[in-house]
């Protein structure tokens, strides 16, 4: 039936990393989120000398459709993943920073409404099927995001010359301050 739980995801990810000689650990710990809490397994990978946490299970379960990508748990630091994961740190490499975090690498780590509107506008102009971003913890945008996301999407869409976005879906992973937008495009 090809089904597994978190340990299977983590071991499969390690298997793939081993095939390309990417140092990878399977981490055993606990996870706690709005979905539930309990024993959990995920990975630590070493990329260009930096260790990062990767949780392919939670990136998969937070995606509400098989085609909706989620990168909320891709290449996190200890502090970032500790928002909803716990583990015995003495058994694993330290992950003090996350230079290869998906959102950092893709310039989708935002701390202001102006940055959000600009990123949304550029993404809509390019007719991206999915738009993903992370809000910087402690930023003004963190306090405003729940009240302004719909408005920012609509403002960005209204600036587009040749397309309109009459409907869209959005959601995210609140613990990791990651969000996605899936626009439905129409042409003017």
Task: Name what the model sees in each region.
Residues 7-79:
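Hydrophobic/aromatic-rich core segments of domains that either
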Residues 1, 77-188:
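N-terminal accessory/pre-domain segments preceding catalytic cores
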